[in-house]
Structures are given as structure tokens and as C-alpha cells.
Amino acid sequence: MVGREDVQSFLEQFHAKMKVFGIIYRDDRGKNRKALEELEIVPSYRKIVIESLVIDDYVEGPVIDTLNKFGEMWVFGKDVKEREVYIKIMISELIPQTICISFHLAEHPLRYPFK
């Protein structure tokens, strides 16, 4: 089972790497682009939301990326403009940048084990 310390360690590594190398967004996924429109936010605002992730926002992970095999994915949730947003991020083993795979409205209520 993942503990608070594991989530904190991941977030520290993720934010440090994001600060140095940046982040790649999977904007080729339609629901990620659509979420920006529905939330009426500019793409760069996602970075602010992701930078503000804390342990209490943790939903699940690490989940193995069996599709692309880039590493482990971690899922978080955050309220943006009073709407719950599903955020899936990862530290890639293959490229220096961090990756935001999903940033879209939650399709169902998220469960936060540390809240």
C-alpha cells in the first residue's frame, strides 16, 4: 500500500524535474483539450494547478504504463473553478520532461485516501 511518504516523495521528484526540464501535455487527447474550454482556462494554467498538487490530492498510483511503457503513472484530483479535475502525471524513464497524460473533468467522483 502506498503511504503519504511515497506520495510526498513522488511529488517532490516530479516538481523538481518539472522545474528543470518542463512538462509535456498530451493535448492530442480530445478530452484534455475540451476540459480547457469547459473550465475556461488557458493551457498554461494547467501548470499552476499541477504545481499546486499535494498529498491530499492523491487518488491512486503508481500504475504501470502498459501502453507506452514510459514509467509509472500517478493520479490526482483537484478542484478547478469548483469542478473536479482528473490529473494523471508521470516521470518518464525515457525522456527528461515530466508528462501530463490526463487533465480533464472527472468522469466520476474521485476517492482521496489521504483526505
What positions do the PLM features span?
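Compact soluble domain cores
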Residues: V2-F70
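Charged, low-complexity, helix/coiled-coil-prone segments
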Residues: R29-R33, I89, L110
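Functional cores of ribonucleases/endoribonucleases
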Residues: I55-I95
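Enriched for short, Lys/Arg-rich terminal
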Residues: M90-K115
